[in-house]
Amino acid sequence: MKKEIILDLCGGTGSWAKPYKEAGYKVITVTLPDYDIRKTILKDGHITFVGKDKSHMVVAKAVYGILAAPPCTMFSFARTKARTPRDLKQGMECVRACLDIIWSIMEVKQETKFKKCPLQFWALENPYHGFLPKFLGKPAFTFDPWKFGDGYQKKTAIWGYFNEPIKKPVPMTDEVKAHLKGNRVMNTVKFNYLKSKDIHPEVFGKFDRQTRLAITPAGFANAFYKANP
């Protein structure tokens, strides 16, 4: 049984890290309301995640891999009707916190002699159509959920150091062919156009719409795990 530690930063429902957890890895999900990533303490080779009434300490050199999904609220181009103005400085607070954790572990475990990356992998996710690419530059990998077997469009960007997952597009069925007559892409529905009940319907009623919007599609999550075990 795997004992390696996976940090699931701003993990929400834990959907991206789910395949690792099911495979026996020790997944530590750092997300609100349990922990505020911005209050993380990095000191003496240890990482302490701080919550309102609890904390959790991790030895930096024990971390195997990191998945990070900082909130896209302030970055997404879809933010057009929000009551509060877009605040990119506020949005970057969680991004900086995630990167600080990643970099601190890379520094602690540096083994120049063996020319190996301290972390086996790290990846940071956010919508492709947003402002974060203007801060972090060109992403290492981009995908739409339909390219991994999930039936919708939501172009996503991934930055980091990892093996690229193998894409497995939605099968070209007669139904898909019929829809394609008026569309230039495999999928016919953009994520933002889905009815609320159709956004990850498997957890409709359990999580609110905003939480379900942030769920990592299962097809991609499984493919990422297989490429980065």
Model feature map: region roles:
Residues 1-229:
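Conserved active-site and SAM-binding loop architecture
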